Amino acid sequence: MSRHYEVVFLVHPDQSEQVPAMIERYKSLIEGGNGTIHRLEDWGRRQLAYPIQNLVKAHYVLLNIEVDQAVLSELVESFRFNDAVLRHLVVKRDGADTEQSLIMKSKDEKGDKPERSERRRRDDEEGEAPAANDNDGDNAEAA
């Protein structure tokens, strides 16, 4: 019987270039066992909440999958025997999560913002024009 799971695993930052190959290996393992991948997100290198093996950053990958217990056991076993995987977490879910995670949504929003130097230049240009009206008392954003 297939169930839905959310899987997050952390990869050693020195092994970040190996992550696409690892993802392909895990995808083939899941799909080879008649499983389904509903969502796959590569979050990239992120700050850890606490040091793991004297590391402060790790490469995060999120999977939402639908597999049976045998395939899940094989996947977890492959995490355990891969030295590059620092941590892994498997959580049983009620259904398939297919929409983008909050982390990826916030990453996309940050990606839409202009570069810092471009923002500063634009802010400087905007700051020169209304300089005469700075102290009129109507500007609540200045507080």
Swiss-Prot record:
Q: What does this protein do?
A: Binds together with bS18 to 16S ribosomal RNA.
Q: Which organism is it from?
A: Xanthomonas euvesicatoria pv. vesicatoria (strain 85-10)
Q: What is this protein called?
A: Small ribosomal subunit protein bS6
Q: Where is this region: Disordered?
A: 98-143
What's a single GO BP term from this record? translation
User: Residue spans with biased composition (Basic and acidic residues)?
Assistant: 105-124
Answer whether the UniProt record assigns the keyword rRNA-binding to this protein: yes
- Entry keywords, A to Z: Ribonucleoprotein, Ribosomal protein, RNA-binding, rRNA-binding
Q: Which GO terms describe its molecular function?
A: small ribosomal subunit rRNA binding; structural constituent of ribosome
Q: Which GO terms describe its cellular component?
A: cytosolic small ribosomal subunit
Instruction: Give coiled-coil spans as residue ranges.
Output: none
Highest taxon of the lineage: Bacteria
Q: Which Gene3D superfamilies match?
A: 3.30.70.60
Q: Which InterPro entries match?
A: Ribosomal_bS6, Ribosomal_bS6_sf, Ribosomal_S6_plastid/chlpt, Transl_elong_EF1B/ribsomal_bS6
HAMAP family reported in the protein's UniProt record: Ribosomal_bS6
**Similarity remark:** Belongs to the bacterial ribosomal protein bS6 family.
